[in-house]
A protein has these predicted regions:
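A short, structured surface patch at a secondary-structure boundary
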Residues: 68, 73-200
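Extracytoplasmic substrate-binding proteins
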Residues: 184, 188, 192-230
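Bacterial N-terminal signal peptides that target proteins for export
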Residues: 1-9
Length: 230
């Protein structure tokens, strides 16, 4: 789980409860849980759930384990930009998804995305986030990128050159411009998450919003450099 939290902090990433897997709902504030202390990242709150707290089901012997990440809106104080629920893949995670669906929050405070972890296929829209994933040792999860010409990472270039080779391992698909991504390529890529940088008053993400793929809004470019790493 530590790497998931670091990745979330680093890019506000969220490989990140809501009622439907990979879907979106309105959300209330974070529920009770174990809040991780952030030394520098003031716009990010991460709460661990499980370990015998109220989410456990003693009758069924289930200890529902998941993490909740709340990203504060950097442009409007006191509001939330996005909420992410990270649920491990597998049978236990499936039960957690079902449990959270029954307990769905009705407060309309921010968009919520459920992310099954670990994320193994992602589309990364900007170079700094690609570099971050390499530094974290998560580079194999990069399966698509935008603005390839501006990504000066030799391994990304090499893997992108293999995208047409069906026998190649972990190729990277060129998804076009981050301002006008190739939706068909992204659909074919089947990413488990899309990592991008949000902007004030962007008006949403157009067709990307309709793909039902978790969009990880990483506004780390406006933070103090230390806050990008927790």
């Amino acid at each position: 789980m530590k790497k998931q939290y670091i990745l979330l902090c680093g890019a506000t990433v969220a490989l990140l409860m809501a009622a439907c897997q990979g879907g979106k709902t309105a959300a209330a504030d974070a529920e009770a849980g174990d809040t991780l202390e952030m030394k520098y990242a003031k716009l990010l709150t991460i709460v661990k759930h499980g370990d015998g707290e109220e989410t456990s089901d003693a009758a069924e012997g289930i200890d529902y384990q998941y993490a909740e990440a709340l990203v504060a809106n950097p442009w409007k104080a006191g509001t939330m930009l996005h909420r992410y629920i990270l649920i491990p893949k597998g049978e236990e995670g499936d039960k957690t998804v079902a449990m959270l669906a029954k307990r769905r929050s009705t407060g309309a405070r921010c968009t919520t995305d459920t992310v099954r972890t670990p994320v193994e296929r992602s589309a990364v829209f900007i170079a700094p986030h690609c570099q971050l994933m390499y530094e974290l040792g998560c580079q194999q999860a990069i399966r698509g990128v935008c603005d390839l010409d501006y990504i000066n990472i030799p391994d990304v270039k090499k893997r992108a050159a293999l995208s047409g080779n069906t026998s190649a391992q972990n190729p990277i698909v060129n998804c076009g411009s981050s301002m006008a991504p190739d939706i068909e390529r992204i659909i074919a890529l089947k990413p488990e998450a899309i990592l991008l940088s949000p902007f004030e008053n962007s008006g949403g993400y157009g067709k990307l919003d309709k793909l039902h793929i978790p969009i990880i809004e990483a506004a780390d470019y406006i933070r103090h450099w230390a806050g990008r790493n927790g």
